[in-house]
Every structure is written in C-alpha cells, then in structure tokens.
Amino acid sequence: MSTLPLPGHFDPKNAEIFGYRPDLAQVAMDAFDFKKLHSIKAAGADAVKMAVVPIDAQEDFSHPEGTLFVAGRSGRGAIDDAVRLTEFLYRHIHLITGIYPTFDTHFALQVFSAPFWVGPAGEPLSPHTLIVADAGGVLNNVGLDGTVLIRNVKPRPEMAWWLCGANYGWLVKQMLHYVEELARGGKYTLYLWPPHTLLGTPGHAMTGVLTEARMFHSYVRGVQSHGEIKGGHPLSECYSVFGEEVRTRFDGQALASKNTRFIDVLLSHDVVVFAGQAASHCVKSSIDDFLTELVARDAALAGKIYILEDCMSSVTVPDGAGGFAADFTDDALAALDKFRDAGMHVVKSTDPLEIWPGIPAALARLAS
C-alpha cells in the first residue's frame, strides 16, 4: 500500500489559526469512512511498529499570537512545520502505530520564569534575559549581549513556604547549585522565558491541525490517543521529555529522575520518528537524552531513529531592527550533525519512506 490521499477535512490554512478547533465528532465519522475506503487494519496488527513523536507542537509555540512563537529564520517556522507534519501523518496513517505528542506544561512560578526572581531591592526581572553565577558564587541577571542588568538576584523569599518547607536558605543554595550545574554539564545558560504553555491556558493545547490529525489517527487505527506531560518541576528546566536539566540537589540527594517509562514505550517500536518544536531546545534536548540512553543500552539502536528536519524550527528572538537578538539555529544544525554521526537518520517528511536509510524492509514494501 502506497501513501494515502489527504482526507477531505484537512485544510492547511487552518495551521495559521490560533485556537482552531476541529469538529472531532465529524472527524470520527470521517475516520470510519476513510478506514473502510482504504482497507486500513488496526494498529495492533502492525508487523513493523512505527512511533511518531511530535515534541511540544502547542499553540504558544505554533502561532504569532502565542507567547513564544517558534518563527525560525523564515518567520513562519512552526506554522509551515505543522502543515508538513500533518500531511506526513495523514499520508502514512496506515503505517503509523502510535502518535506520542509531548506537552510542555508549566505553572506561574518556575525557575525559568522572570517572576520567580527578584533583585536585591525586590525589583522584578525581565523575560529574554539570563541568570549566571560569577566566580564568587553570586547570581547575576544579564542581557543576551552579556551586559549585567541586576547583580545579586535571588529567588523570591515568599515562595519558600510551599517550595521547601519555609527554608529559604536551602532555596538560595539550591539555585546557586542549579546554575553552576548547568554550566558544568554544558547545558544552556538559565534563560528567563516569557510565560508559555501554562496549564489551563489556550497556549497549552496542541495546535489544531495536529490535534485533528492525531485524533483521526486514533479513530482510524483503533489505538488510544497519547500525551506525555513534561516541564512541571518548579526548580528545574525540562527541555527534554526524558528528564529535567539538573536532577540533583546541592546536598547530594536526588531532585528529579529520568523518564525511563517513556523511553521503554518508544523503544518497543521498530521505527521512532521525531519532529516538533523547537529544534534548538526541546527537540534537540529530547533526542540528545534519548541518544544517551540508547548508547548505554546498545548503540545500534540509534539506527531506528528518524528526525524530520523539515518539521521543526529553531528559537529566534527578533531585535526590532530586522535582525535577531538571539538565534539558536546553529545549535540545532550542530545537533543534527551529532545525531547523524551517532547513527540516527535525518530525513524530510516528503522523502518516500521506502528510500529512508535503514528502514525495515517490511515497512518499505508497505510504503512503496
């Protein structure tokens, strides 16, 4: 069976609409007709199991109206990515066993949010700035150009009662440990983001065209819709779906743990396909963590991983003068090179599956 036609309900222009809500009752009816017309079997009968993992394809990242639109260098990044990924899902719905979207899920006060921090006089910090530690163990707020904006910043004291049993001294020590561990581990510098994907807000939802495709897949293939939640720990960033950026406390105890359950779910498939937002951050970090786990188990497992390079974009921060105050595209490109070198496959959504390198022969026959 070759690729399938796009279903009649799909309109790529809907990818441009923040808050697009598909009629899921009608989608379910369409799915039954589509399944019968194309003689599509249940997902449980797949001889070769394929998982597709859309990373954080949520409204806040996918639209200019969102609080953290991933525009890339083109200015339309996540919008066009959503169209291509949606078309890929529809055309290969008969081959995709499971779709496993991740959901960046945040709350008002977390370590990467500006309102979590204050200056020495209680002054607020601004988004799109950084927190760094100097040689004397003092945390400073700096601009993207490295200019020191506020010296000796600290977590807000009033948070201590619910974060750490009112032990504010513990919280201050933990934040210094956190920032220093980021540097030691070669992680991103602590970046203060605008509020985004807050649980219960419209921006947390999966972008509408992908919700439509995800549910259509569930109805056609008779498989449950999935959703992997990440990002709720108040004391650590969590770019990767497989765990927090820093998982230790300053006293040597554990702060968080690796998401081995989801790793095992994905590795139960023969082919795992990654896409989503942003290529420079959550996609990059998730695949990097996944690669570390694969190498620890069996480096040859990297050969079952495919990355849709045309279904992801990088974070860019406009400078208001036609350029970028921050552009993380080069980080994403370097990561793709690393993943290729490790044995993963970087492909395009428009490439026929049968020519994907290393694709299982049984799947290639079905796709041709």
Kindly give the residue locations of the regions a language model identified.
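Active-site-adjacent betaalpha module
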Residues: 1-53, 57-100, 106-368
